[in-house]
Amino acid sequence: SFRTDYTSPSRKMNFSPRLAANYYWGNMMLSGIVGRYTQLPENNCLVRRPQLMSEVCMQYNLGVQYDYEGRFCKAELYYKDYDRLALEETDADTKAVFLTSNGYGHSKGIDLFFRDRASFKNLEYQLSYTYNIAKRKYREYLELTTPQYATRHNAAWVVKYSLPRLRSIVSVTDRFSSGRPYHNPMLPGLMNDEVKPYNSLDLGVTFLASKKVIIHASTSNILCRKNEFGKVDNKAVLASSDHFFYVGVYVTLGKKVTYDVSNF
């Protein structure tokens, strides 16, 4: 495929070719993707300098997946190369700070996923894991460093149990990630320390009221763990609430049934 767009502030035309290929071998599929993607810098950067160029990402993916009799597994390697990121630079003469499009970075890792709907009656479980290494030279970071939002290890397990007579599904989800990086002024380097690991145990119940009405309720972090999302002045940044509640009603107005209760 091919995409092009024109950005008026920078007066630049962006060309984004993309190629995807799949090879099927029985119940297995091999896939490869290479593509160029662009996006505008964030609004707060464009306000300071509207002439900033669109940020660029060259993405490469190689994956394999296997699907057989209710069991599905997938593994994917990826590499992303970033260019023209917004970067704060200082004029050598005036010492004025200004934004340029000279930032760059990369991200690489592996995604693993497994789902089993066949081993146990009325029960489905999922396992997922992501390993990621990300580096950026952008914004106020004048050397390659790990962004504040990037965590190296992310994992989750999900168990769903169906209650056909009650037309309901009960789910339990446990999410884990290694600590987010933050800058500790007592240590050398940038983004040189991590907060404690993240963990959240969530519960959910889905009720099929009719073929076109689904009611879903969930609550997160039932153990009320104090998860940290960074540090400012050596004080932990916490969520506004230890856990959240959600209740949603999904109604299909068309003739066809569009919602699949097993997706909740």
Model-based region annotation:
Residues S1-W25, L40-P41:
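Signature of Gram-negative outer-membrane beta-barrel scaffolds
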Residues F2-T4, A21, G32-R36, V64, ...:
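Transmembrane beta-barrel strands of outer-membrane/channel proteins
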Residues M13-F15, V56-Y60, D67-E69, Y104-I110, ...:
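Residues that define the transmembrane beta-barrel architecture of outer-membrane proteins
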Residues L19-Y23, L62-Y66, I110-D116, L127, ...:
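Residues on the lipid-exposed face of transmembrane beta-strands in outer-membrane beta-barrel proteins
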Residues Y24-I33, S54-R115, K121-L123:
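Membrane-embedded beta-barrel scaffold of Gram-negative outer-membrane proteins
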Residues N27-S31, G70-K74, F120-Y125, R165-V170, ...:
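Repeated loop/turn-to-beta-strand initiation elements of outer-membrane beta-barrel proteins
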Residues Y79-D81, T100-H183, L223:
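Gram-negative outer-membrane beta-barrel transporters
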Residues S119, F176-H183, V205-F264:
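C-terminal beta-signal and adjacent terminal beta-strands/loops
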